[in-house]
Amino acid sequence: MTDAAQAPHSPKFPKGTRAVVLTVSDRCFAVQQDDVSGPVVLRLLENLGAESPLAETLPDELEQIAAALLRHAATAALIVTTGGTGLAPRDVTPEATRLVCDRLVDGLAERMRAEGLRETPMAALSRGVCGVISKQGVPGGTLVVNLPGSPRGAGTSLKAILHLLPHALNLLAGRTGHASELAPGQDSATPGAIHTEGT
């Protein structure tokens, strides 16, 4: 089944949305194994309308992960990480994410874990978080989403929240039309969208 077939009603990202995929893995960084999860995430984001998403591979080093998140937050609306969310001593992606985020979006992480548990009880061991990095002097912020490192886990987790991400990015940008009030295929930046406060 294709990605598009699994999520046929997912709204598209706002036009011009910039996204970044960070693969966090010592072995991938050292070119000791191929990155198979990053391409899965990239394809899903492209299908949703992300504009030429960037990809970068990082080692499991807290400081380097945090620095990369802050660097990309200067230009990207969405950063998706894959890897480093488990219980191994060097799994520090959630810690790096918490370090740079001003607000956590617990509901997204809970939704991903709930969907993962439908496939495997091992999903309970994922510590991934989601949060927002505020932009200095600029309205809105960058949404950060932590995914597991396995291709299946990353794909399942991201698909669980794909339909929520466009509305989340609209809200961060100050466009507050309720998703339930938008016509099919219309985001809240579209002329004629109904605008209300809150979510």
Where are the language model's segments positioned?
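Non-catalytic beta/alpha edge segments that cap or flank active sites
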Residues: 1-199
